[in-house]
C-alpha cells in the first residue's frame, strides 16, 4: 500500500522535445490573436527588412518579430522608447526555450506619440503641396451625391434624413469601415471608385463622413493613402469627420470641410423651400423682364413703322426729282448735240485752210533742218582741226621725245632733280634716266675735281 502511494507521487518523466512541444501547444492553443501594450526597446532591422525588438513594461520583457510584409504597412517610423499596442500571435521555439510575439499590426499607444507622428506627417505632406490644391467648387444642385461611410450607426441616417428634408436627390452609398486597420484603404478605394465610374453614374459631389471619437478612433482619416486619394479626386469632396473640434489630415486635402455629417449634407444641397422661393422670385423677375422687353419691342415696331412711312415718302420725292432731272438732262443733251453738229460743219469748211497752213509749216521746217545740219558739220570740222593742232603741240612737249635727242634726267638719292653740277655732292648716288632705260652711279671727289678743272 505504501509502495503504491510512493509510485503515485513520482512525477511523470518527459523528454526535452516532449516538454518543449507541450509548452508550445499550451501557449499557442491558449493564446490566440492577442494585443499587448508596451514600450519598444532594442530595435533592430535586418538587411532583409524584418524588425526584431522587445516590448517591455517595468522589468517584464516580451520578444517581438515584425516580418517585412507587415513592417512596410506601418505608416510611421519605429523608435526605441515608443509606446505601442501590438496585435499578433504568441509562438514558442523549442530550439532555445523562448517564446515571442509575431506582429500582425502595430499602432502608437500614447497620445503624445500619435500627435508627434501626426505633426511629422502633416509637415511632410504639406511640403509636397497636398494641402494647397485648387479647390473644386461644390455644385449648387447636385443630381447625385456619393457618401463614403459605414452603413451602421447614426451618421448615414443623419445624412440621408437631412438631404431628403432639404432637397431630395439621388444618394449613392459606398460602404466602408471607418475605423480599424484596413479602413483607410477602403475609403481611398471608394474615392477612386467613384472617380472611375462612367460619367452617367458618377456623383456630382462626395461626402466622406464618420461620427466623433478619440484620436485613435479617427486615426484612419490621417492616413497618407486616404489624403492622397482625396487630393487626386476630380470630384469635389466634403469631409465630415467627428465633431467641429476634431481635425484630421483629410480635412486639409478636400475641397470643403464640414464640422459634422449633418452640416455636410447641408453644404451638399440647398433647402427645398428656399430653393422654391428663389425659383418663384426668379420667375417673377423673368416675367417682368419679359413683359418689359415685349413692350419695348412693340414700341420699337411702331417706331420702325413711322420710319418706314417717312422713308417711303422721302424715296417717292427723290424719285420724282430724279425723273424731272432726267427730262431736263435729255433736253440739254439734245441742244448740246445740235450745237456740236453746227460747230462740226463750220470746222469742215475751215479744214482746207488748215491744210495749207500745215504744208507751209512743213516746207519751212525742211529749210531750217537743212541749215541746222550744215551749221553742225562746219562746227565739227572746226573742232577736229583744233584738236589736231593741240595733239601736235602736246607731242612736242613730251619729255620722252627730248630724251631721244640725247638728253638725260639726273636725280639724287631723294628723287630730286639735279640741273647743275653745284648741286651734286661727294659719294652721292645718282640715277640717270635715258629714253631707253636708266643707270645708277656714285660720284667721287675725283669726278668732281675733274669736272671743276
Swiss-Prot record:
It is an enzyme of class 3 (hydrolase). It catalyses: Exonucleolytic cleavage in either 5'- to 3'- or 3'- to 5'-direction to yield nucleoside 5'-phosphates. The keyword Cytoplasm applies. GO terms for biological process: DNA catabolic process. One of its GO terms (molecular function) is nucleic acid binding. One of its GO terms (cellular component) is exodeoxyribonuclease VII complex. InterPro entries: Exonuc_VII_L, Exonuc_VII_lsu_C, OB-fold_nuc-bd_dom. CDD domains: ExoVII_LU_OBF. Keywords: Cytoplasm, Exonuclease, Hydrolase, Nuclease. It comes from the Bacteria. It holds the Pfam family Exonuc_VII_L. Bidirectionally degrades single-stranded DNA into large acid-insoluble oligonucleotides, which are then degraded further into small acid-soluble oligonucleotides. Heterooligomer composed of large and small subunits. Belongs to the XseA family. This is Exodeoxyribonuclease 7 large subunit. It comes from Rickettsia typhi (strain ATCC VR-144 / Wilmington). The lineage of its organism: Bacteria, Pseudomonadati, Pseudomonadota, Alphaproteobacteria, Rickettsiales.
Amino acid at each position: 500500500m505504501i509502495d503504491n502511494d510512493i509510485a503515485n507521487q513520482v512525477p511523470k518523466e518527459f523528454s526535452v522535445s516532449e516538454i518543449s512541444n507541450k509548452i508550445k501547444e499550451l501557449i499557442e492553443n491558449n493564446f490566440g490573436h492577442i494585443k499587448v501594450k508596451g514600450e519598444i526597446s532594442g530595435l533592430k532591422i535586418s538587411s532583409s527588412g524584418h524588425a526584431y525588438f522587445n516590448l517591455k513594461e517595468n522589468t517584464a520583457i516580451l520578444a517581438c518579430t515584425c516580418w517585412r510584409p507587415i513592417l512596410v504597412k506601418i505608416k510611421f517610423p519605429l523608435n526605441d522608447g515608443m509606446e505601442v499596442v501590438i496585435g499578433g500571435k504568441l509562438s514558442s521555439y523549442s530550439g532555445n526555450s523562448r517564446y515571442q510575439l509575431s506582429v500582425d499590426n502595430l499602432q502608437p499607444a500614447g497620445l503624445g506619440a500619435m500627435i508627434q507622428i501626426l505633426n511629422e506627417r502633416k509637415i511632410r505632406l504639406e511640403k509636397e503641396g497636398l494641402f494647397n490644391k485648387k479647390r473644386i467648387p461644390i455644385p449648387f444642385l447636385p443630381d447625385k451625391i456619393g457618401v463614403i461611410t459605414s452603413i451602421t450607426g447614426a451618421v448615414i441616417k443623419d445624412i440621408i434624413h437631412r438631404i431628403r428634408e432639404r432637397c431630395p436627390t439621388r444618394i449613392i452609398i459606398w460602404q466602408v469601415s471607418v475605423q480599424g486597420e484596413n479602413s483607410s484603404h477602403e475609403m481611398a478605394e471608394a474615392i477612386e471608385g467613384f472617380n472611375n465610374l462612367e460619367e452617367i453614374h458618377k456623383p456630382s459631389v462626395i461626402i466622406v463622413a464618420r461620427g466623433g471619437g478619440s484620436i485613435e478612433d479617427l486615426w484612419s482619416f490621417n492616413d497618407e493613402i486616404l489624403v492622397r486619394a482625396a487630393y487626386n479626386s476630380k470630384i469635389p469632396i466634403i469631409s465630415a469627420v467627428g465633431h467641429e473640434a476634431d481635425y484630421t489630415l483629410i480635412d486639409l486635402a478636400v475641397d470643403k470641410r464640414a464640422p459634422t455629417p449633418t452640416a455636410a449634407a447641408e453644404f451638399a444641397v440647398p433647402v427645398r423651400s428656399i430653393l422654391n422661393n428663389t425659383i418663384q422670385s426668379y420667375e417673377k423677375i423673368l416675367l417682368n423682364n419679359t413683359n418689359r422687353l415685349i413692350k419695348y419691342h412693340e414700341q420699337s415696331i411702331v417706331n420702325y413703322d413711322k420710319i418706314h412711312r417717312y422713308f417711303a415718302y422721302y424715296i417717292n420725292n427723290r424719285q420724282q426729282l430724279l425723273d424731272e432731272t432726267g427730262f431736263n438732262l435729255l433736253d440739254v443733251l439734245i441742244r448740246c448735240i445740235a450745237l456740236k453738229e453746227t460747230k462740226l460743219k463750220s470746222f469742215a469748211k475751215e479744214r482746207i485752210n488748215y491744210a495749207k497752213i500745215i504744208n507751209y509749216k512743213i516746207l519751212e521746217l525742211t529749210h531750217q533742218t537743212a541749215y541746222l545740219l550744215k551749221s553742225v558739220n562746219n562746227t565739227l570740222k572746226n573742232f577736229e582741226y583744233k584738236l589736231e593742232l593741240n595733239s601736235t603741240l602736246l607731242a612736242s612737249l613730251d619729255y620722252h621725245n627730248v630724251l631721244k635727242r640725247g638728253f638725260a634726267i639726273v636725280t639724287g638719292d631723294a628723287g630730286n632733280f639735279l640741273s647743275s653740277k653745284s648741286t651734286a655732292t661727294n659719294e652721292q648716288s645718282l640715277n640717270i634716266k635715258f629714253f631707253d632705260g636708266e643707270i645708277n652711279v656714285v660720284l667721287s671727289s675725283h669726278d668732281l675735281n675733274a669736272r671743276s678743272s
